[in-house]
C-alpha cells in the first residue's frame, strides 16, 4: 500500500503467522476459532470520564470507498468503519472479524463461516452475499479500482480474466453457500490467503447504499458500514469524526465514544498539537525534533518496527531511465548511511532491497554494491554514467518528484546534493499534493519520484508482486518476463523455505535491473499519549483498531 510515511528499520517484532492454516499446506481440514479482542483493560485501570480520541492522519483522504483507495491514510479511517473477514490483534496476528471460523482442505478452496450477529449500521444483517458483491466490485473494470490487482495476486479464480475485460465479473471464484457461509476458490494453493483477507480492498460495502447513492455513498448522511464506528462528520481538509456503531456485534466492548482523524500534513504542526494536549497520537514526528523529544517527552515517544520501505522509482518508459546504467548509477550514488544516520537517526536502516528485514519468513541478502564504501559506489556510478554517454560537458539532468512533506523534502534535497557532488548530476526538485502526486505517478508524468510501500500483509509477496509486469501501482513500469516467472513460481509454492529462496532470486534480479533505488527501511515513530491504553506496539503493519483503545485517567 502506498504511503506518505517516512521512517523505517529492523526491530524486535518479526511476526510469524502462527496458525497452521496459514502456514501449512496440510490436506486435512484446518478450522480456526479465536476469542475476539476488543478493549482489553487491565484490572485496576481507572478510565477517564471523557473517552474521545483525536489522532493525526497525515493528509486528507482521497476516498473512503474501500474498492477505490490505495493509500495508508485512507486505510486507517476505513478500518474503523468497515470490518472484513479477519482483523489483527496487537501483535499482528490474524483473528476473526466478520468470519468467526474458516477452513480449507487444500489451500485452494477456503470456506468462511460468518457470525450471525454481524450487522450493518442500518440494522441489515451482514451476509455472504455482501462479500460476493464487494469482491466482484473490486475486480469489475467499471469500478476502476487501483487495487484490483490485489485479488488477482491471490490467484482468485478468473480474477485476472475479469480485470482484463475478458470474462464477466460473475465468473469470479466466490460464492455464498448460504446467508452465513462464504466460499472462495483460488487457481493455485496460497497457504497465507487468510492473512491477505485483512486488506482494505476486500472489506465489504453495503450494496443497496452503493447502488442508490453512487459516488456519494461515502458521505456521512449516506454512509452505511459494518465496522465498530460509523461516520458522523467529514469536513474535507479539516476532520473526520466517527462514533460507535450501536449495531456492531461487539459494541458492548467499545470504550471510546468518539474518534476524530485530523489531516495534518505538517509534522511540526502535528507535534505541536500533541504537546498542547489537542491530539492523542501523531501520524509521525519531524525528524529535526527527534532528539529533543527523546529528552523531553520520553514517555510519549513511541518507536516500533514498520513493514515499509522507502525508495525512489525511475520512469523506465522515458529516456535516459530506460538505460540500466543510468538507474544503477543514481542508486549507487545515494549515501544511505548519511540519510539513516545523520538525517533521520531514529533507528532506520539502509535498504538495498525492496522487502524489509522484519518481513515474516524472509532474510534478505545485501547485494555486492551494498557492501562497498560510498567512495567505491560513487566511482562505479561515474563509470556507468560515462558509459551511458554523460559527462561534465553533457551532464544528466532530470526532475525528482515527491509528495508535499518537510521530511520528504529534506531527503530529496540531500539526495540532490549527493547526485550533484558525487557524480555531477543536475536535479530539479518538484513537490505535489498527495492526490496530484498519485495521479502523476499513475499516469507516468515524472522522471524519477519518491515512493514508499507498506506491506498489505506480512509476507514477502506483498512487496515483490508490486514489481510484476502490468502492475503499474505507484508509477512502476518494470517489465521482466524472468521476474514475472519467479513471482508466479513463488505464489504457487506452499513451502516457506522454497518461497524464500525464490524471493531472494527476485530481489537479486531487481538489483541487476534497478527499476527502483531502495533507500531505507522504516520505523514508525510518533508521539503517543501515556494516557492512551491498548496502543498496539507489536503490530508492524501499524493496524490500529480504535475499538481496542481506551483513555486512562
Regions found by a protein language model. Name each.
Residues 217, 247-292:
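Ligand-site clamp/hinge motif
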Residues 526-553:
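Long beta-strand-rich cores associated with HINT superfamily self-processing modules
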Residues 141-142, 197, 302-303, 317, ...:
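Periplasmic-binding protein-like
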Residues 56-106, 224:
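N-terminal lobe/hinge region of extracytoplasmic solute-binding protein
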Residues 46, 111, 374-375, 426-437, ...:
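Extracytoplasmic/peripheral linker and loop segments enriched in polar/acidic and small residues
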Amino acid at each position: 500500500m502506498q504511503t506518505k510515511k517516512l521512517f523505517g528499520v529492523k526491530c524486535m517484532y518479526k511476526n510469524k503467522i502462527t496458525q497452521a492454516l496459514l502456514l501449512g499446506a496440510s490436506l486435512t481440514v484446518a478450522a480456526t476459532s479465536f476469542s475476539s479482542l476488543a478493549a482489553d483493560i487491565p484490572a485496576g485501570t481507572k478510565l477517564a470520564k471523557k473517552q474521545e480520541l483525536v489522532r493525526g492522519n497525515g493528509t486528507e483522504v482521497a476516498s473512503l470507498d474501500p474498492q477505490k483507495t490505495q493509500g495508508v491514510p485512507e486505510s486507517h479511517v476505513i478500518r474503523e468503519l468497515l470490518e472484513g473477514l479477519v482483523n489483527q490483534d496487537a501483535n499482528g496476528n490474524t483473528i476473526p472479524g466478520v468470519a468467526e471460523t474458516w477452513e480449507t482442505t487444500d489451500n485452494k478452496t477456503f470456506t468462511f463461516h460468518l457470525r450471525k450477529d454481524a450487522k450493518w449500521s442500518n440494522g441489515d444483517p451482514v451476509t455472504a452475499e455482501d462479500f460476493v458483491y464487494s469482491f466482484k466490485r473490486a475486480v469489475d473494470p467499471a469500478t476502476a479500482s487501483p487495487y484490483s490487482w490485489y485479488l488477482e495476486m491471490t490467484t482468485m479464480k478468473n480474477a485476472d480474466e475479469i480485470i482484463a475485460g475478458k470474462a464477466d465479473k460473475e465468473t469470479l471464484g466466490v460464492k455464498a453457500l448460504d446467508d452465513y457461509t462464504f466460499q472462495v476458490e483460488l487457481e493455485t494453493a496460497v497457504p497465507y490467503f487468510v492473512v491477505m483477507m485483512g486488506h482494505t480492498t476486500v472489506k465489504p460495502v453495503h450494496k443497496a447504499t452503493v447502488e442508490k447513492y453512487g459516488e456519494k455513498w461515502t458521505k456521512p448522511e449516506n454512509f452505511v458500514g459494518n465496522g465498530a464506528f460509523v461516520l458522523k462528520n467529514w469536513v474535507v481538509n479539516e476532520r473526520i469524526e466517527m462514533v460507535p456503531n450501536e449495531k456492531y456485534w461487539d459494541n458492548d466492548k467499545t470504550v471510546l465514544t468518539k474518534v476524530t482523524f485530523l489531516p495534518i500534513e505538517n509534522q511540526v504542526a502535528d507535534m505541536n498539537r500533541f504537546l498542547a494536549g489537542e491530539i492523542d497520537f501523531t501520524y509521525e514526528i519531524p525528524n529535526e525534533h527527534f532528539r529533543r523529544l527523546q529528552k523531553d517527552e520520553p514517555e510519549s515517544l513511541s518507536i516500533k518496527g514498520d513493514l515499509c520501505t522507502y525508495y525512489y522509482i525511475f520512469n523506465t518508459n522515458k529516456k535516459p531511465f530506460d538505460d540500466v546504467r543510468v538507474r544503477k548509477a543514481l542508486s549507487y550514488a545515494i549515501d544511505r548511511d548519511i540519510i539513516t544516520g545523520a538525517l533521520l537517526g531514529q533507528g532506520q536502516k539502509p535498504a538495498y532491497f525492496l522487502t524489509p528485514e522484519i518481513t515474516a519468513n524472509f532474510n534478505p541478502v545485501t547485494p555486492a554494491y551494498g557492501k562497498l564504501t560510498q567512495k567505491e559506489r560513487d566511482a562505479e556510478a561515474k563509470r556507468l554514467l560515462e558509459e551511458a554517454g554523460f559527462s561534465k560537458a553533457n551532464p544528466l539532468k532530470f526532475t525528482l518528484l515527491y509528495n508535499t512533506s518537510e521530511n520528504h523534502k529534506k531527503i530529496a534535497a540531500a539526495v540532490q546534493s549527493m547526485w550533484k557532488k558525487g557524480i555531477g548530476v543536475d536535479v530539479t526538485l518538484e513537490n505535489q499534493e498527495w492526490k496530484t502526486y498519485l495521479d502523476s505517478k499513475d499516469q507516468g508524468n515524472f522522471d524519477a519520484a519518491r515512493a514508499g510501500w507498506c506491506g498489505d500483509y506480512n509476507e514477502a509477496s506483498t512487496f515483490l508482486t508490486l514489481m510484476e509486469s502490468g502492475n503499474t501501482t505507484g508509477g512502476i513500469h518494470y517489465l521482466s518476463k524472468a521476474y514475472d516467472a519467479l513471482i508466479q513460481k513463488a505464489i504457487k509454492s506452499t513451502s516457506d523455505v522454497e518461497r524464500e529462496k525464490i524471493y531472494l532470486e527476485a530481489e537479486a534480479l531487481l538489483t541487476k535491473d534497478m527499476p527502483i533505488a531502495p533507500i531505507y527501511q522504516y520505523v514508525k515513530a510518533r508521539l503517543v499519549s501515556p494516557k492512551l491504553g491498548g496502543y498496539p506496539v507489536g503490530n508492524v503493519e501499524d493496524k490500529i483498531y480504535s475499538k481496542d483503545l481506551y483513555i486512562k485517567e
